[in-house]
From Swiss-Prot:
Responsible for the release of ribosomes from messenger RNA at the termination of protein biosynthesis. May increase the efficiency of translation by recycling ribosomes from one round of translation to another. InterPro entries: Ribosome_recyc_fac, Ribosome_recyc_fac_dom, RRF_sf. It is found in: Cytoplasm. It comes from Deinococcus geothermalis (strain DSM 11300 / CIP 105573 / AG-3a). This is Ribosome-recycling factor. Transmembrane segments: none annotated. CDD domains: RRF.
Amino acid sequence: MPDIKAIQADARERMGKAIEALENNLSVLRTGRANPGILKKVMVEYYGSSMPIDQVASITTPDARTLVITPWDRGALNPIEKAIRDSDLGLNPNNKGDTIFISLPMLTEERRKDLVKNAKNYAEEARVAIRSIRKHALDEVKKVEGVGDDEIKRAEAEVQKITDEYIKRVEDTFHKKEQEILG
């Protein structure tokens, strides 16, 4: 049977993973500045298997509005171009023979609002995950045997304090991304 400290440490670790998942989800949202992270979820069909674009090419940002994709094998050029074109990112790759250039257009106000809405949804998913972890931790604390009611109450208060800390991190992460998107 785990002790109270172990339950709290486990909750903290799992809440940290929820924050990491939020940051990963937010990193693929386009902000108007070139960021190789927006291509993170693009999968390239190459030699009969599907793999992330960063495993078949290097992605650089020569300026704030351009991405340059240089495949490690020229045979991957067309599959990379097709994967980017078929993605839901709304990007138009320009194949230059040995590299692919992507000029990022200015975001329209409507597109910015959509991106903020997506970011808000990701933040809500993280909040729900953190609350679920809190509920699990509180249930585990109540099951600990040989501990007085006062100790249980203190442990529950500590779990709530940890939860509040991670919910605040979700809010801060969301607001930072919102500011990036809205420019």
